[in-house]
Amino acid sequence: MSTDRYEIDRGKDFGHLEHAPIVEAVIEIKCPPQVPWNEDTIPDEVGKLLSGYQLLDSRSEYSQTVNFEDNVPIPESMEKVGWKGVRYRSEDESYIAAFNRDGFVFSRVGRYETWEKFSAEASRVWKVHRSLARPSDVHRIGLRFINRIRLPGSGIDLDDFIYPGPQPPKNLGFPIVSFLHKDTFAVPGNPYLINIIRTSSPSPSAGGDVDYAIILDIDVYLQETFEVDDLKIEGHLEDMRILKNEVFWGSIPRPLLENLRGDSG
């Protein structure tokens, strides 16, 4: 296992996948506000500054008290501990932005287009959060892409759709009904960590047809504190995008990649 510094090539061109299986893309910036984060004022302030979006919901945080009786947990009560934040959704329902007490979350749901469009809109909306919250420090940045790869049916070789594919124990040739696998990787010489989850969704039921798919969930993140700096944040996100692409392209067998590429080449 090499521990040499991994050079992240920001200029690397991965090409375009016309049929990319992305179902959600998320940017998260953990940065506590330096001003009061009040339910009475923040939702309206966001609405005034954020064009092209409408209020989706307002969310609170709760704690649950659990008692034990004969070593069996018994939930007792839910208590509101504070207001978490507000979510706004774009008028075309393709973006959701969360303005939270602990930071900012921006999601693309549905059909993904390009990184340039996604990151540009995230940057625009992030500036609204920054202007209201006035954070001084960033504690975590995350970039997460969730892919759903549909399978044509049962009785297929999963190695044709995901690498590495799930395997039974060496001494047992049992068929795989469902699987869940998680890895966390460090990037040598860089401050990033990568969580990779490969799982089946939904699990097939005995005797019934199901829409069977593989979920490839890639989460690249940086967990260290630095002063808020938009150029620095953009640089980290660009590094994370490259790492995310490296993981995706290294997880999908070439014949499937060609199918996902489509006619655009």
Where are the predicted features?
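Aromatic/basic-lined ligand-recognition segments
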Residues: 12-14, 78-92, 96, 107, ...
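Extended intrinsically disordered, low-complexity coil regions enriched in Ser, Thr, Gly, Ala
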Residues: 37-48, 113-136, 226, 230, ...
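Short glycine-rich, low-complexity/disordered patches
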Residues: 56-70, 131-149, 176-178, 246-265
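Hydrophobic alpha-helical segments and helix pairs
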Residues: 87-130
